[in-house]
Amino acid sequence: MTESIISSRTASISSKEGYEIRQGSTDSSSLDLEKKENAVDTTIAKPFDSDEDIADVEKAGGKKINNSLIDETFAFMQDAKKLDPLTPKQESKLKWKLYIYLLLMLGFLDMMLFIGKATLSYSTILGLFDDVHITSNQYNNLNTLFYVGYIVGQFPGHYIMQTFPLGKFVGLVTFSWSVIVFLHCCAYNYGGLIALRFFLGFTESCLLPAMEATMGMFFTHQEQAFLQPVFWISCLSCGIPAGFIAYGLEFVTKSIAPWKLFMIITGGITFFLSIFLFFYYPDNPSKARFLTDEEKLYTIDRVRKSTRGGIENKIFKKHQFIEALKDPITWLFTFAAFTLMLSNNLAYQQNLIFTSLNVSDLNSTLVGVALAGYNTVSAIIATFAMYLIPNQSAYHAMFWMLPSITGGIAFVALPWSNRIGELATMIIASDFGITYIIALGWTTATSTGYTKKLTRGLMFMVGYAIANIISPQLWQSRDAPRYYPAWIVQIVVAWFVTPIIYLVARVILARRNKQRKELKDKKIAEGSLETIEKTYVDTVDEFGNPVKVLIDNSMLDLTDMENLNFVYPL
């Protein structure tokens, strides 16, 4: 099927030649890819006839950029000869391989990540309060301190994540997090827990952005949208294994406290996971050990054709950082993350509310399992809905606010004596998590340029963390057991205002798409479409001589503002 997968460089740069990206091969004996609409374009360059050709490109609107903007996968693609187009059967096989390997690995990591966050919550029904002598308000402070560490860790974490191999970064961070979970067993007072929760938040802070970055490297925009709920089933369902572990530990009569055993079990699983991740977590598709060289090429080609942008770049770019901060979409997503996550502490208060409703510690774990099951079903429904109705992320996110608003109002309105009704409405109110899942994927999918993408993700997580610093303080013991102030903030700010922000973002992105379509139609009419699809790069050959290379924008680390061929997913 293929002539060759990896070969010597097909477009070796000479001292006298510039190079032009074009669909087609570098020698006359190869089959012209222009005749095959779906062929994989792995040929990188073809010599210009003269420097005048390059000047013409510049006059036509081509951009001269530094060689550092070239994508990390460029060299791998440049070392490959063309491949025949994938048959439907081959593409299906490749997609399922990506789904199974990546979603299982990322899903398990995500599940352990959220179990790690919730260890303190489960410990409250396993004897933590009595052993460490803390109050409910101090418990809320510990949840706040976790997110203080979370926000502090965002800035150094994102920088390290961009400049170092992603797989090694994820493995080492996971190892550090497992050690901190183990150390919880040594805490004997409030002060010890303060330090541990802060550093746990610090170490976990960049794992979620790293996983989202990986999703963006391996899956197309459409796949990312409907796979987000599938990926997040691992988080939403984490209460099932964690709940059953906690349930079993309720029967432990050994001298070691049940909550310490819970820490040992979760920390131990995370420790072994970190070893696996260090060796097998992929930096990008070209470094994925579970893919053949041929599959790596097809994966890169599928993604860059979908996103019309690069895969990864290890150089921090100040102009992309500034552009991200100036882009109103960045601030809309950041503000939406803040407003929505003002309701996130509901997950950490549920066990305490169960106790207030006279549900035993033993039965509280089972109610938590039921809650996780409900959230899992909601995620499955959301997945099918986004698959059947693609490119409507804003409307999907808005829809899943309706159950939360309904459940929240019902919880406040029902009499406290209606225990079953209160439990049911609180479970229904938890559907806001689906909106968060959709928004997180949409946030990164609407930007290109690796530094800009990471900056936007950082800003989103800052909004997320600030809200989570505030939200535990809404649940003051003086407001127990109904906590009316907390519920009012959740219903009005988190679940009503947030969808409006998403709608505004959609309007802005739709307007940008319309302007780009008009520009593209104009360029087609003028016969100059290449000026918005390709960019020429000044670089040097192996002898140090300056050369000029015209490269498809999808192989460059351009932002969505620089790459006018990029179409925003809505």
Curated annotation (Swiss-Prot):
Give residue spans, biased composition: Low complexity: 1-15
Please list the GO biological process terms of this entry: cysteine transmembrane transport; cysteine transport
Q: What residue spans carry the region label Disordered?
A: 1-34
Membrane topology according to the record: Multi-pass membrane protein
Phosphoserine modified-residue sites: S14
Question: At the top level of its lineage, which domain of life is listed?
Answer: Eukaryota
| Entry's Gene Ontology cellular component terms | endoplasmic reticulum; membrane; plasma membrane
Under the heading InterPro entries, the entry gives: MFS (IPR011701), MFS_trans_sf (IPR036259)
Q: Where in the cell is it found?
A: Endoplasmic reticulum; Membrane
Report the transmembrane regions from the record: 96-116, 141-161, 163-183, 198-218, 229-249, 261-281, 328-348, 369-389, 397-417, 423-443, 457-477, 485-505
Q: Which Gene3D superfamilies match?
A: MFS general substrate transporter like domains (1.20.1250.20)
Gene Ontology MF term list: cysteine transmembrane transporter activity
The family classification in the record reads:
Belongs to the major facilitator superfamily. Allantoate permease family.
Tell me the protein's name.
Uncharacterized transporter PB1C11.03
Query: Native species of this protein?
Result: Schizosaccharomyces pombe (strain 972 / ATCC 24843) (Fission yeast)
